[in-house]
Structure formats: C-alpha cells, structure tokens
C-alpha cells in the first residue's frame, strides 16, 4: 500500500515557535473546510463523520499526520497530492474555541503548526508545557496577525465556520479551500451564514477531483 510521508512534511511546522514580528507579505490566510454539497460542515449535533468520510475510506494511499494526536488517512492519489501541497504551504492554524474543544486541543500540538484559538476564556489546564496552542481574546485581527507572524512567511489555515465567517467579514481571507464531500446533510451548521458585505466575489477556482470528494480552491477578491 503506498504511503505519503505526511508526517515528515509537518515536522518543520511542529518545531516552529510563536514569534511576533513584522508579517511577511507572502503570508496568506486560507479557509480550509470539508463541506457537504448543500453547504453544511456538521450536522445538528456537531457530527462531522459524513463530511470527513473521504479522509478515511476514499482510497488506498495512506497519509500520516503529525502533531501530538497523529492519525492515518486513506485517500485517493489526487487527494493525497492535494493534502501534500496544502500542508507544505501552511505554517500556522487559526480556529475558534468550538473547534479546539471538539479536537480536544489536538493533544497540545496541531499537525500543521502553531495553533491560535479565538476565545473569550482560556480553558482550565491551558496553556500547557511544550504546547504550541495559543489563545487569543482580543479579536480576529489580532489573531490573524499573531498567526501570520508564527507562520513566518507561510500561509495560515483557518478552521471552523464562525472563525471563517469572521475572517471573511473583516476582509482578511485570501483564499477559500473547500473539500466538497459527496453527501447531502439537509440541515446542520452552515459554513457561509452571517456574512456581511455580500456578495463576496471569488476568482476562478482550481479543481481537483478525488474519490468521494472534490477539492476546490478559490481566490477571494478583496473589496
């Protein structure tokens, strides 16, 4: 069974430490989410099994994650290549508290690099020794600035519907990467609710066809 060396690609990101400095111009802020064809990223109970199913059973290429809580995905070759390119580009992650809680803090170290969590209250037991998870309570602009600085010229990946919406509304997103899963949920948590200043105009997409998933990458045209 073929294996992609995903864990080797993320080791450099795991060694990255938070360093607040002038942000390199090359840093991009990229929304990254799996979504059903009808626009939901989770069901009404926060379940994500259907939209993440392509990670686990869409092919025979093994993709190993890094971080403190490693996983092994089984995807098609096009999806493995897509993940390789994406992870190679990322230097930090920005999420909301809901995503942090669902992921149980990624074991203290996110596979894609330092993680910045938007929250009103730091959870009990955090921050932890040797963890690269940082908490931000002074707004989306500050969170993006800190994540860009930690990314050291690489891109910042944004997870979570609410955090992505905040970035869009603040004009901070450069690209939207959507993995369209081959499923209709009918109800649940929508990715693109509560948008201000619509329409948000996107550029022409790059499309990669996997098995059970279509990977779309749109540039966001700045207002």
What residues fall within each predicted segment?
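Enzymes that bind and transform nitrogen-containing heteroaromatic metabolites
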Residues: 4-223
């Amino acid at each position: 069974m073929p294996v992609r060396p995903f864990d080797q690609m993320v080791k450099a990101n795991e060694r990255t430490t938070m360093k607040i400095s002038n942000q390199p111009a090359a840093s991009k802020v990229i929304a990254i989410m799996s979504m059903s064809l009808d626009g939901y990223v989770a069901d009404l109970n926060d379940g994500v099994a259907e939209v993440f199913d392509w990670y686990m059973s869409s092919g025979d290429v093994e993709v190993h994650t890094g971080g403190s809580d490693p996983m092994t995905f089984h995807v098609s070759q096009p999806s493995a290549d897509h993940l390789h390119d994406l992870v190679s580009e990322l230097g930090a992650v920005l999420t909301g508290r809901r995503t942090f809680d669902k992921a149980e803090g990624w074991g203290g170290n996110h596979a894609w690099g330092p993680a910045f969590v938007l929250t009103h209250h730091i959870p009990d037991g955090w921050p932890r020794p040797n963890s690269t998870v940082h908490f931000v309570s002074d707004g989306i602009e500050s969170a993006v600035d800190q994540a860009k600085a930690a990314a050291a010229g690489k891109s910042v990946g944004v997870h979570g519907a609410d955090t992505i919406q905040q970035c869009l509304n603040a004009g901070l997103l450069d690209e939207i990467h959507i993995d369209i899963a081959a499923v209709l949920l009918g109800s649940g948590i929508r990715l693109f609710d509560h948008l201000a200043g619509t329409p948000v105009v996107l550029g022409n997409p790059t499309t990669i066809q996997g098995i059970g998933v279509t990977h779309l990458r749109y540039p966001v045209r700045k207002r």
